[in-house]
Amino acid sequence: MSSSANSSPATTKFKFTDNLWDGFDLLVKRTDNDLIQSKNILNFFKKKAELEEQHSKKLEKLSLKTMMTIDESTSINAISYNSSWKKIINSSMMESEQHTLLNTSILNKVIQPLQAMIKDMETKRKKILQEGIKLKQDMKEMVDELKKSQFKYDKAGKDLESSRMELREYREQLDHQQQQQPSDSDLNNISKIERRIQRCEQDFSNCDEEYREQIKATNDFQHLYNTEKLPKILNDFEHFVISHSHFSKSYFTNLVSVLIELPSAYQQNYEFVKKSVEMIDITNDVQEFIRKNLMKKQLAQPFQYEPYIEGKLTKKTISLTWNNKILSQFSRSSNNNTATANNTSSGNLNPYLNGGIGGTKKDEPILPTASFKVSLDELMNRQKDNHPTLEVPYVLQVLSTRIAQMKGHVTEGIFRVPGIISTIKETRLRIDKADFNLSNIDDVRTPAALLKQWLRDIPTALIPDSLYQQCIDTPTNAIAIVKTIPIINQRVLCYLINFLQIFTKFEFVAHSKMGTSNLAMVFAPCILRCTSTDANVMLNNVPNERLFVETLIKQIPPPLNTNEFLNLPISMSDAINDSEDIEELNDLDQLSNDDNNNSNTNTSNISIGSGSNSNIVVNYSNNSPNIESSTLPSQSVVTTIETLPPLNDDHNSGSGNESNSSSSNSTTTPTGSPTTASKPRGPRTQTLGWVRIKPAPKPSAEPTITLSSSIAAGTTTTTTTATGITTTTTTTAGPEKTIISPVIIKPAAATPTTTTPTTTPTTTTSPTTATIPAVSTSTIKTSSPDRTTPLTSSPPLASTKSTDELMKKLDQFTQETTPSIRIATTTTPTTITTPTTTATTTTITTDKTTPVTSSPPTASNISSEDLMKKLDQFINF
C-alpha cells in the first residue's frame, strides 16, 4: 500500500484544463517562446546550409585548380608520388560533393518543413489568442452589466427608503406639533411625498426585475465559460505545445538521419547526437512544465440575488421649510457617491468585480503602448525599431501632420476653440493603444486639442521646473534658457515652435485669426508649468509666460534639413479659396489705397468711336495703361479724356473728400487754363505677406436715361437720373449745342486687353491715336449700386491760344511718360465703355452730333511745315 501511495503522485497526468485553469497569460508567453525558439533553429540551419554550400564550392575550386598544376607528361616526376597526390585531391573533390549533398539534404528535410511548420503554428496561435481575448472581454462585459444593474437596484432601494423615511418623519413632526387638523399645505406635502413613493416603488420593481434577469444571463454565460469556452481554449493550447514539440523532434530526427548517411568517417562524430535526440521525451516535458506551474482550479461561485435590506440610511431631521428640504436632498445625493461594495448585503458581489475579469479601478493604469503621460525618453526608446531616424516622438509628428492635412493653419480659432470632448477621449484612447490612423477624424479641433493634451501630460514639462522662475524673470532671454534644457526637450520644443511658426504667416493668420501673441498665450501652459499653487502668483505670471513663448516663436530659427513647412502637407495656396476672390496687397497699397482698396488689378476699357471703323481702346491692367489704337477720321477736332480709378466703398472720409473735391474743381476750371498731367502709379515691386477677400459683386439693373437740352457757351450743366447716372458738361465759346439726346446706358462685358503703350497725335490728313492726359475739366460719372466710376475729359484747346503755346504743349506731351488719349469730335454716334470694379461695363451712346471744342487754333508765327514735323516727331515717340 505504501509503495502504491508513493507512486501515485508520479503517475498522475496533469492537464491544462485542470492544472492551468488561470494560466491563459502563461500559455500565451509559452507558445510565443516556442515560436521564437523555432525561428532561431531555422536561422541556424539556414546559415549552416549556406556555409556548407560555400565550403563545397571553395573546396571544389581549390581541388580543380591544384589538379591543373600536375603535369604527367614530364619524365622528372615520381609516378607513385603523383598518383598518391591525385588521390588526395580526388578525396577532397568527394568531400566537396558530400558537403553539397549535406546542404541539399538540410534544405529539403529540415529547413523547408520547419519553415512551413512555423508559418502554420503562427496562424493557429493567432486564432487561439483571438478567441481567448474575446472570451475574456465578453466575460468582463457581462460582469460589468451585472455591476451596473446591481448599482441601479441599490440606488432605487435607497431612493424608496429615503422617501418612506421622509414621509414617516414628516408625520411624526406633525404629531409633535399636536395639530388637531393638518393644514392644506401639510396635506399637499404629504400627497407629494406619497406620489414620489409610488414612483420609487415602480422604479424599484423595474430595477429588481432587471437585476434578476442580469444575474441569470451572467450565470448562464459563466457556466458556458467554465464548461465549454475556456476548456476548449486550454485544450487548443495544450495541443499546440504538444504538436510543436512533436514536429520539432521529427525535424531533428531528419537531421540526424542526414548526418548518419554521410561516409563512415563522419558517422562516429554523430552517434552521440543520435542518442541525445532519441532521449527526447515530449510527454515528460509537458508534464514537467505543468508541474512547475501548478494552479489550483477554483471556479467562481454562481451569482446570487441579494435583496436590498432597509436600515442602511441614517435617520435625518426633515424640516417643514422648503430650504431645508432642498439642502437635505443635496445631502442625500452626496451620500449616493459611496462605494459600490456597500450596496449589497454581503458587501461583495463577485471576485471579478474586485480586480478580476470585470474589475475597474479609479486610476486606470497606463497602457504599455501609451503615448500620453509617458516621458519623452521612454517614447524615444520605444520607437527605435519602427522609427529609428525620427528625432521627436512619433505621436507629435502624427498629430501635427493630421492638423496640416485638415488645413488647421487656415482654420479660424485653431488651438483656441475647443473640440468635442467625447471624440477627443475616444481618439486619445486609440492613440494609447498604438492606433495612429487618424484618417477618420473630420474635425481639425480634435488633433489640435490632443496636441495640447499630450504636451500637458508629459510627466516633466518641456521647460523643467527648476528653470521656471528664470523664464518668468527674463522672458526675453528665452533662447539662452532653452539651450540648458535636455537634448530631447530641445528637439521637441524646436519642432513645436517651428510648427507654430507656420501658423504665424500673414496669409494664414488672415484666416485663422491666431497670430504670434494668441498662439503664445495658448501654448504657454503647455510649455511652462507654474511651480506655485497660489492663484494670484499664477495669474501674475501669465503675461511673462506668454512673452517667453512669443520670444521663442520669433527667435528660434527654422530647421535646415526641411522646407519652411517641415515637409508637412502645407502650401501657400491653402490661403486662397478662389483665385477670383483673393488679392495680394503690397506696400504701395498700404501707403495709398485711396484709389484702389479692394482689387489687385483695375481694368477700364474706353471705346470712343466714329462709326464702325474708328475706335480707341485703353486697357488698364495692373495699374499700367496699355493702349490699343484705331483709326480716327481726318479733319477731327481733338480733346482729351482721362479714366479715373473707381471710388471704393471702404475709403475713409479723407480720401473720399479729396476725390470729390478734385472732381468738383475739374468742372469749374476755366477753358483757357493750362492742364497739368500727373504720373500714374508705377508697377508693384513687392507684395505683402497677406491677402484680403474681395466683396462679391452686386447685381445692378440696366439703367436707361434720355437727356435733351440746349446750353449756352461757357456754362456747366449737371444732370442726374433716377438710376444714379450723373453727367457734368462744360461748354466752350461758340454757338449753342444740343448734347446727348438720347443717351442709353447699359452694362456690357469687360474684356481685359494687354497692348503696348503708344502715343500718337491727331492730324487733319491721316488717322491717328492720341493720349490721355492726367488732368481734366469735364467729368462724366457713372454710378452703380456699389461703385462710382468717374470719367473725366480735359478742356479743348482754346481758339485764342497761339501756335507757340500749342508747340510747347506738344513738347510737354512728348516728354511725358504717361499715355493719354485724344478723341476727335465727329458727326456720328459715339460710344464710351467703362467697366467698373464689378466686372461690368457701362456704354454711353449718343445719336446726335456732340461737338466738344471750338474751332481749331490758328497759327501765329510758325509755319505749317514746322507744325507737321513736330507732329511727326510726336507720332514717332
UniProtKB/Swiss-Prot annotation:
Record key words, sorted: Coiled coil, Cytoplasm, GTPase activation, Vacuole
Compositionally biased tracts (Polar residues): 780-800
Coiled coil: 130-214
Cellular localization per UniProt: Cytoplasm; Contractile vacuole
Keyword tRNA processing: no
Main subcellular localisation: cytoplasm
Name the record gives this protein: GTPase activating protein homolog 2
Native source organism of the sequence: Dictyostelium discoideum
